[in-house]
């Protein structure tokens, strides 16, 4: 553009300003595109993590444990070998006792076991009220079981219970010492009894097992394990259990 009075030609200046403006706009668009792409990938990553977490939680609720792996029907000596293996980060055990019988349990199948603290924690049986059984006739269980029995969720509550094992039936009175919520999705509920009572009615199995056990498995040990990492859990667990020839291992 030429100024008539002064003879100035502004066209080159205008072109330069226009180019700078377009370049600035392109840079702004590029920055916005990067921001949107970052937001998109972050959202997708968050959704993927959320879905994985939800699937893991659902699987844990169904199997009834947060453990990486478990192995069933061991003798005490077999468990000792397994628990001393350096390929296992943490391990807990339970001793199978039997099943609760009676009308209260027709719709709420309930098993009875002794479990150590690690086992109780990994199968979501750590009491939020009270404690795990210590005295001989103490018992801990879920609010789901107490509701099925028509009992209050109050520590100190007395209950009469009939238990069937592989070889006998026992009816005893227990005092409630620990309570947790329980999960209705679990395939069965659990009652935990003291070690001294368990030794009386379900002495632990010793020696070498051959893979054949009676229906209930009274006296046998179930173990739950945490591996060093959550990567390729099945291989880690198999590497450990194969050393001892255990064939009943289940990946959880």
Enumerate the language-model features and the residues they cover.
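N-terminal Sec/SRP start-transfer signal
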Residues: 1-39
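Basic-flanked hydrophobic alpha-helices used for secretion and membrane insertion
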Residues: 48-252
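A near-ubiquitous, low-amplitude feature marking generic local secondary-structure context
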Residues: 4-5, 30, 34, 38-41, ...
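Alpha-helical transmembrane segments
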Residues: 23-28, 32, 36-64
């Amino acid at each position: 553009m030429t100024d008539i009075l002064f003879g100035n030609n502004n066209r080159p200046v205008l072109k330069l300003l226009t180019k700078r403006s377009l370049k600035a706009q392109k840079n702004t668009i590029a920055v916005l595109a990067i921001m949107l792409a970052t937001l998109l990938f972050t959202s997708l990553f968050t959704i993927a993590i959320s879905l994985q977490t939800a699937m893991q939680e659902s699987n844990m609720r169904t199997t009834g444990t947060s453990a990486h792996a478990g192995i069933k029907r061991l003798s005490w000596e077999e468990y000792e070998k397994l628990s001393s293996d350096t390929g296992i980060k943490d391990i807990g055990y339970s001793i199978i006792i039997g099943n609760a019988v009676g009308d209260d349990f027709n719709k709420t199948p309930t098993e009875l076991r002794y479990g150590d603290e690690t086992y109780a924690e990994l199968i979501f049986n750590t009491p939020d009220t009270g404690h795990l059984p210590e005295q001989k006739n103490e018992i801990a269980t879920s609010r789901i079981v107490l509701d099925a029995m028509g009992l209050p969720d109050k520590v100190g509550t007395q209950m009469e219970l009939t238990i069937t094992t592989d070889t006998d039936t026992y009816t005893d009175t227990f005092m409630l010492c620990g309570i947790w919520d329980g999960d209705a999705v679990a395939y069965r509920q659990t009652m935990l009894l003291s070690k001294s009572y368990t030794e009386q009615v379900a002495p632990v199995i010793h020696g070498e097992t051959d893979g054949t056990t009676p229906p209930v498995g009274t006296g046998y040990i179930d173990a739950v394990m945490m591996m060093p990492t959550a990567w390729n859990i099945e291989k880690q667990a198999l590497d450990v259990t194969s050393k001892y020839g255990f064939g009943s291992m289940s990946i959880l």
